[in-house]
Amino acid sequence: MAKSIPKIGSRKTGRIGSRKHPRKIPKGVIYIQASFNNTIVTVTDVRGRVISWSSAGSCGFKGTRRGTPFAAQTAAGNAIQTVVEQGMQRAEVRIKGPGLGRDAALRAIYRSGILLKVIRDVTPLPHNGCRAPKKRRV
């Protein structure tokens, strides 16, 4: 009986040509998504390919602590650390959401030494779109 030839990139053979090897990335875009419950920081190159990401939940914060400014600062630091090692020097920051971690994550990015070209707020605002949910009564 003939042996079957394993497919390239199948689960058994592992990934061939993966993008995990470090690349030189001088410029990039940092996305901060800050909700009331969590903060997610994603770093991409100029073309939009994700280089690294981190969230308050992936940094070990659970429950309501994920929405704190300290958790956002830790998440931003973790996401930026791998990118600085790959040689990123300049970045554009896009912040989305009303959360408490907006400023803390931005401060952590400042401290990393990356030059920020533009800081843009891309929070979606409705122009009187859908009806808002009813107010909570506690």
UniProtKB/Swiss-Prot annotation:
Biased composition (Basic residues): 9-21
Alphabetized Gene3D superfamilies for the sequence: Ribosomal protein S11
Entry GO MF terms: rRNA binding; structural constituent of ribosome
Record's subcellular location: Plastid, Chloroplast
Record flagged with keyword Repeat: no
Primary location class: plastid
Domain of life: Eukaryota
One BP term from GO: translation
SUPFAM superfamilies per UniProt: Translational machinery components
Family: Belongs to the universal ribosomal protein uS11 family.
Classification via HAMAP family: Ribosomal_uS11 (MF_01310)
Subunit-structure text: Part of the 30S ribosomal subunit.
PANTHER family (alphabetical): 40S RIBOSOMAL PROTEIN S14/30S RIBOSOMAL PROTEIN S11 (PTHR11759)
Protein name according to UniProt: Small ribosomal subunit protein uS11c
Organism: Pisum sativum (Garden pea)
